[in-house]
């Protein structure tokens, strides 16, 4: 896993953004958060982001998480995206992965599990990039 991975959190809940950002920063990751899909997509276009944590229900955006995921794929088809939701179930998790997410985490989430999934996603992304380069 490469150093200096920048993680983007897109969630309309300020407390969740701060909690996740703090957790990631404590584990040595750099993170930014945006409260709307539109702001998150703009940042993704202008900055090198290694992974996106994306809420499914973005109440203050034009797009929900699934629509935002599709737009992320138009910007970067390979970036790992982990969907997060407080209203999730197995169907939501499966739907997230079918639509191109790397993984799914349900709120409230266990911090250790979230960090594990982030590390795994970044490791797999790095391996995939190495295979493409070689």
Show which residues each predicted segment covers.
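Flexible nucleotide-interacting loop at or near the entrance of a catalytic core
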Residues: 113-134
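C-terminal output helix
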Residues: 89-91, 105-118
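His-Asp phosphorelay/catalytic-motif detector in bacterial-type signaling
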Residues: 4, 48-50, 74-80
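Two-component/phosphorelay signaling modules centered on CheY-like receiver
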Residues: 2, 14-32, 38
């Amino acid at each position: 896993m490469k150093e200096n991975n920048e993680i983007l959190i897109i969630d309309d809940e300020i407390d969740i953004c701060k909690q996740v950002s703090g957790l990631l920063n404590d584990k040595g990751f750099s993170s930014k958060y945006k409260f709307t899909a539109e702001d998150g997509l703009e940042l993704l276009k202008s900055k090198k982001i290694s992974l996106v944590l994306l809420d499914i229900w973005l109440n203050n955006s034009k797009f929900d998480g699934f629509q935002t995921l599709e737009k992320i794929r138009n910007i970067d088809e390979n970036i790992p995206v982990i969907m997060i939701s407080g209203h999730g179930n197995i169907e939501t998790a499966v739907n997230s992965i079918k639509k191109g997410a790397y993984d799914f985490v349900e709120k409230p989430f266990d911090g250790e599990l979230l960090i594990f999934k982030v590390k795994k996603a970044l490791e797999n992304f790095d391996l995939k990039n190495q295979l493409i380069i070689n």
